[in-house]
């Protein structure tokens, strides 16, 4: 292989793992109809792996599943944003479902393009030294993670709950593992088994672990990011011993201590800073900002008194089913919720609790963020609190109740002032306590829908409004009752995808 060194310094600088490295030329600066032939192209293409996370961790992929649960109720004047999801009007032609499917496959295509380019480079196509290939390998590891992350999240939505005893017959996802844009429909893949889908996720994760060298990094995928993700995957696969081991080991590094004060907890969600963050998606005003997770919980426009004390007109408000989970001294109650004046037409102003976990980062606002996107925060796909909850649940289901209680009590001690460790003589009580704690801690982050699905639980929204008359009093919203195992817990393969891919013709999910 020809020796060349002109890109080594540039590449080394680009992998310096500082947040300013994210400020690069757009991914599309290199056309995807030809493979990359030098190191700088890999460096620039790296941006295309990270860009989609700003959308996929702050938009519909997070909020749509959350609004399908009992935790949030539409307001009487809501804009019908996510109305079909909240009412469980789930159809094959649903635009939200189609968009999320397409966005994940876009991420997969970008990952495939980079992985395939690397394989061609190793074959001697292009001018790369062995040293350069080793440096490029970090980016390839990130591409493997992106593909694993995308297929895993799609499996949670578009496939049944993983069951190792049935996975060989459960329907999985169409696995596209090469960058092969084709106009020939007969070349499109059909659905794999769910066993094959999860096998691919784990294989990609193994590849990523062998290539990504940084142990800890705020804005870049690190070994700790991979470990947190692997623990999450293991929990959903019911590999409880593995999940417990991974999460406990990550906690045991001591790199991500739980915050101890309400001020620090508030800063974690207001300013998006704190010791609990494992991986944070880089954002910068004006062009590198994600979606506004807080917008549906507050309303688009600010009143005359300005942020944050204006009267609110939100699309959704937290239900009493959620609010009543928080007891005395729980610091999350004062951070995740705030009492505002409700601005409702024809009704005297009244107080109501809004969901305030995503209040809008003032640093983004001061940088020139439009008021239409005022309630925008920087997303953190992996935080240490989730690992405490994984450890607690996994240890319990693996038969180690004392360890489960230890991690539950550790998280509670950091969140509840004056907390005294609780002992549990009944496994059922401990299981319910862990599930309640998971709901309280992770609310709004997109987990609860998947939790109900894998726990095989339903819900009933009846009589959960905060104030009579402010919720949308329509039976399929406010009186909605969903039974455990409802077929709509598994989303349909989008109609447009089935129409375009003949291999999917007879592979739609049951019920659609």
Where are these regions (language model features)?
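Conserved, well-structured interaction surfaces
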Residues: 82-158, 192, 205-214, 372-379, ...
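Flexible, polar/acidic helix-loop-strand segments at domain edges
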Residues: 187, 326-383
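Short, surface-exposed recognition loops and adjoining beta-strand edges that mediate ligand/DNA contacts
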Residues: 32-33, 62-76, 127-131, 159-173, ...
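Membrane-proximal, proline-rich intrinsically disordered regions
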Residues: 20-72, 299-315, 322-327, 335, ...
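Bacterial Sec-dependent N-terminal signal peptides
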Residues: 2-5, 9-12, 16-40, 201, ...
């Amino acid at each position: 292989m020809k020796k060349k060194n002109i890109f080594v310094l540039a590449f080394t600088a680009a992998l310096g793992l500082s947040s300013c490295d994210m400020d690069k030329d757009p991914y599309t600066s290199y056309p995807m109809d030809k493979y990359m032939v030098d190191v700088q192209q890999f460096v620039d293409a790296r941006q295309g792996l990270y860009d989609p996370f700003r959308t996929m961790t702050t938009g519909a992929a997070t909020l749509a599943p959350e609004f399908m649960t009992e935790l949030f109720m539409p307001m009487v004047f809501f804009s019908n944003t996510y109305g079909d999801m909240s009412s469980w009007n789930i159809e094959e032609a649903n635009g939200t479902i189609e968009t999320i499917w397409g966005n994940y496959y876009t991420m997969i295509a970008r990952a495939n393009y980079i992985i395939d380019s690397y394989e061609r480079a190793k074959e001697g196509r292009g001018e790369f030294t062995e040293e350069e290939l080793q440096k490029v390998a970090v980016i390839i590891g990130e591409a493997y993670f992106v593909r694993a992350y995308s297929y895993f999240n799609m499996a949670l939505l578009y496939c049944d709950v993983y069951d190792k005893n049935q996975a060989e017959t459960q329907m999985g996802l169409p696995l596209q593992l090469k960058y092969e844009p084709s106009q020939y429909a007969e070349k499109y893949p059909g659905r794999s088994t769910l066993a094959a889908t999860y096998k691919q996720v784990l294989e990609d994760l193994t590849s990523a672990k062998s290539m990504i060298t940084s142990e800890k990094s705020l804005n870049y995928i690190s070994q700790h990011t991979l470990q947190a993700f692997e623990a999450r995957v293991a929990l959903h696969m019911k590999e409880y011993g593995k999940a417990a081991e991974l999460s406990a080991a990550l906690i045991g590094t001591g790199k991500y201590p739980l915050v101890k004060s309400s001020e620090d907890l508030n800063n974690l969600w207001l300013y998006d800073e704190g010791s609990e963050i494992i991986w944070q998606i880089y954002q910068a005003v004006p062009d590198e900002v994600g979606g506004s997770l807080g917008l549906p919980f507050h309303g688009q426009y600010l009143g005359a008194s300005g942020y944050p004390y204006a009267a609110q007109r939100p699309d959704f408000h937290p239900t009493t089913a959620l609010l009543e989970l928080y007891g005395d001294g729980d610091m999350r109650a004062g951070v995740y919720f705030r009492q505002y004046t409700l601005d409702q037409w024809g009704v005297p102003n009244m107080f109501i609790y809004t969901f305030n976990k995503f209040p809008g980062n003032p640093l983004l606002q001061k940088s020139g963020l439009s008021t239409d996107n005022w309630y925008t925060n920087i997303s953190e796909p992996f935080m240490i609190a989730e690992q405490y909850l994984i450890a607690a649940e996994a240890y319990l289901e693996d038969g180690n109740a004392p360890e489960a209680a230890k991690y539950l009590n550790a998280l509670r001690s950091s969140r509840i002032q004056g907390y005294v460790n609780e002992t549990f003589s009944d496994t059922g009580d401990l299981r319910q306590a862990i599930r309640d704690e998971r709901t309280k801690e992770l609310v709004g982050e997109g987990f609860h829908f998947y939790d109900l699905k894998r726990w095989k639980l339903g819900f009933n929204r009846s009589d959960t409004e905060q104030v009579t008359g402010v919720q949308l009093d329509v039976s399929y919203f406010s009186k909605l009752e969903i039974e455990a195992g409802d077929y709509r817990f598994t989303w349909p393969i989008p109609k447009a995808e089935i129409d375009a891919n003949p291999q999917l013709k007879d592979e739609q999910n049951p019920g659609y």
